[in-house]
Amino acid sequence: MLYYLFQYLEKFDFPGAGMFGYVSFRSLMAIILSLLISAIFGEYFINLLKRKQITETQRDASIDPFNVKKVGVPTMGGIIIIVAILIPCLLLGKLHNIYMILMLITTIWLGTLGFLDDYIKVFRKDKEGLHGKFKIIGQVGLGLIVGLTLYLSPSVVIRENVEIQRGGEIVEVVHKEQDQKSTKTTIPFFKNNNLDYADFVGFLGNNAQAVGWIIFVLVTIFVVTAVSNGANLNDGMDGMAAGNSAIIGLTLGILAYVSSHIEYAGYLNIMYIPGSEELVIFICSFIGALIGFLWYNAFPAQVFMGDTGSLTIGGIIAVFAIIIHKELLIPILCGIFLVENLSVILQVRYFKSGKKKGHLQRVFKRAPIHDHFRTTLAQLDPNCSYLFMKPNSVFHESKITVRFWIVTIVLAAITIITLKIR
């Protein structure tokens, strides 16, 4: 809104109005504003949650070997993150930009889904919350909306990157002059760092492109569902999900920024995406909101984000990556989320297979994987066999959290480095 106001005032030579035309200025304003909102509003909101007794106990206090008591800690803190994202975007963003619209829809959509889950847990005293099938329906619905919008909107275009070679060596990367709709996505080790979903069905001839879009929509649905659930599982320790997501958000912000500048996109050999510069405003709001939230969520947590926050930040990461055509980099960038997902899947399937044979068996001491590292041998079921018992010693959750952050930083660096590998 302020963007449009100052754009109008610029006609009258209003001092400073021209600054709002620069993405860099609006991005810095967004990250500062979102941080202040989450830090200042957060304190008042946490006190409100306490007065209303909207609190949560430790999900499983028996797994905390350090006897850290987490009784009566407010939940639904994800509302702080959502508000701190939306306000700067509404004030500083171009609200007619299709990418900004999609990100705002994603934030509100999954924020509502997570809120319903937390509401059922807190007010209806149902620990299971919203039934799993309704969560999946909500995630699939969002993925379908995002995928179809990117397919149907005439504003969603790219300029493909092309390598110029001489004597077998790449001497320059240029971009085609024409904007085009495309099912291509960025992935390392492929020609021009691009993979076209339509290539999977090239045998269909003229129909390959249309079927390629169907594949793209299905991939979108899968990525949104997987990453939002991964972030949800990762939210099991103080500061874990917020810290990891801020690091991932920073990496996506860098990729969005270079994708919106044709020269920088050429340097990294990735496609140029006109209009994607507005995503930098959004991701700066996202990062600022998470950092401000960490002020209260770092160990020992004064507030939990709940599913209101974790489902939302996971969905934001997924949709953002899809919009900038970097969804196939998610297994690297969001490696922590992937491992959390896989650890739960392996644990459940291995347990069920053992149950059919009449004995108890598990892969890890506990799942998701972060709980494995803080579970003592004394806490294990003596009647159950475990594939992985190491480490014998346990770590404090703050140490586990910081180490997971470090792993995410390394994965973020690898994600960017892989784009320069020829």
UniProtKB/Swiss-Prot annotation:
Annotated signal peptide: none
Essential cofactor(s): Mg(2+)
What metabolic or biological pathway is this protein involved in?
A: Cell wall biogenesis; peptidoglycan biosynthesis
- Known InterPro entries for this protein? Glycosyl_transferase_4, PNAcMuramoyl-5peptid_Trfase, PNAcMuramoyl-5peptid_Trfase_CS
Q: How does it sit in the membrane?
A: Multi-pass membrane protein
Any one cellular component term from GO for this entry? plasma membrane
Query: What would be an example GO MF term here?
Result: phospho-N-acetylmuramoyl-pentapeptide-transferase activity
PROSITE patterns (UniProt xref): MRAY_1, MRAY_2
Q: Where in the cell is it found?
A: Cell inner membrane
Q: Where do transmembrane segments lie in this chain? A: 28-48, 71-91, 95-115, 136-156, 208-228, 239-259, 279-299, 313-333, 399-419
Sorted alphabetically, which Pfam families does this protein's record hold?
Glycos_transf_4
List this protein's GO terms for biological process: cell division; cell wall organization; peptidoglycan biosynthetic process; regulation of cell shape
The primary location reported for this protein is membrane
* Statement: the UniProt record of this protein carries the keyword Cell division: yes
Assigned keywords, A-Z: Cell cycle, Cell division, Cell inner membrane, Cell membrane, Cell shape, Cell wall biogenesis/degradation, Magnesium, Membrane, Metal-binding, Peptidoglycan synthesis, Transferase, Transmembrane, Transmembrane helix
The enzyme's E.C. designation: 2.7.8.13
Q: What catalytic reaction does the record list?
A: UDP-N-acetyl-alpha-D-muramoyl-L-alanyl-gamma-D-glutamyl-meso-2,6-diaminopimeloyl-D-alanyl-D-alanine + di-trans,octa-cis-undecaprenyl phosphate = di-trans,octa-cis-undecaprenyl diphospho-N-acetyl-alpha-D-muramoyl-L-alanyl-D-glutamyl-meso-2,6-diaminopimeloyl-D-alanyl-D-alanine + UMP
Xref: HAMAP family: MraY
Which family would the database say this protein is a member of? Belongs to the glycosyltransferase 4 family. MraY subfamily.
Task performed by this protein: Catalyzes the initial step of the lipid cycle reactions in the biosynthesis of the cell wall peptidoglycan: transfers peptidoglycan precursor phospho-MurNAc-pentapeptide from UDP-MurNAc-pentapeptide onto the lipid carrier undecaprenyl phosphate, yielding undecaprenyl-pyrophosphoryl-MurNAc-pentapeptide, known as lipid I.
Could you tell me what this protein is called?
A: Phospho-N-acetylmuramoyl-pentapeptide-transferase
Its ancestry begins with:
Bacteria, Pseudomonadati, Bacteroidota, Bacteroidia, Bacteroidales
